[in-house]
From Swiss-Prot:
Ranges of the Intravirion topological domain: 315-345
Domain Ig-like V-type: start-end pairs: 91-190
Compartment list: Virion membrane
Stretch forming the signal peptide: 1-23
Organism name: Human cytomegalovirus (strain Merlin) (HHV-5)
Name this protein carries in UniProt: Viral Fc-gamma receptor-like protein UL119
Residues with glycosylation annotation: N34, N48, N95, N104, N148, N179, N198, N217, N225, N241, N244, N260
Function: Serves as a receptor for the Fc part of human IgG. May thus be involved in interfering with host Ig-mediated immune responses.
Region named Disordered: 23-43
Cellular component GO terms held in the UniProt record: membrane; virion membrane
Transmembrane segments: 294-314
Membrane topology summary: Single-pass type I membrane protein
Amino acid sequence: MCSVLAIALVVALLGDMHPGVKSSTTSAVTSPSNTTVTSTTSISTSNNVSSAVTTTVQTSTSSASTSVIATTQKEGHLYTVNCEASYSYDQVSLNATCKVILLNNTKNPDILSVTCYARTDCKGPFTQVGYLSAFPSNDKGKLHLSYNATAQELLISGLRPQETTEYTCSFFSWGRHHNATWDLFTYPIYAVYGTRLNATTMRVRVLLQEHEHCLLNGSSLYHPNSTVHLHQGDQLIPPWNISNVTYNGQRLREFVFYLNGTYTVVRLHVQIAGRSFTTTYVFIKSDPLFEDRLLAYGVLAFLVFMVIILLYVTYMLARRRDWSYKRLEEPVEEKKHPVPYFKQW
């Protein structure tokens, strides 16, 4: 007991002799984000003996991007989309078909959604005109979209726009996003007329009118490189004759084709100075020029027939009259009768 009291007395004396001695307690904490914090603890005693406060904070922060890979993501299929526009001859309804063509395998791509946009100028924003999704959606646009999974075709229908319009459709599938752009030129195609010349040959006249639009970059229909082709199967048929005509007071460009067989619909491909129109299905109407000519030929044939009949009747009457005059002019020969014979008795 005496020894313990002696030790305590020695410690107290040493504290009074060295009041500037400092005692520090250091603790190091490592945070989960690699941040090291070093701090000291300050202790005050009733004898005014204080431990020096020494605080050192060392922070080491490391930043790294976090990448999350979904293990359920499917491999995207490589494919392209080709769109063709068509409209009825009366130019009221619009129909378009976008064909999905696979490049890397024979499986059909899983199209999740398709959104179509349109604009009438080349610099303005696109406006959504149609939407189709594999999930239920209430978004209705100006165009009706339906997808044929068997044929891998997107079918688009609606009212034909009143002016040339640029369309683009965005196809979203697993891991892929593809845009398909196509144009619908409304005004250049004035009319398409067809005439059946015989059982194996058909004459088609395509009438186009001048059209100015920003998509044409200032080009003209009368440019030497501007032309029209018709599709007959896999063949592109060039025009047989190109000329300028005036129809109903309008200046038009006429392209004449001769096709083998009889058609009610033709695939039209127009190119104006390097800018190609979307291939368009155009319904053929009977050629009014041919109908007018046919009517004129019919009337002319009828008149010729009537003239021939009249000439024939006139000839017959004249011949008969001439025969009558000849009968009158001929001298009448008296018939010599034999001398009466009387029998002698």
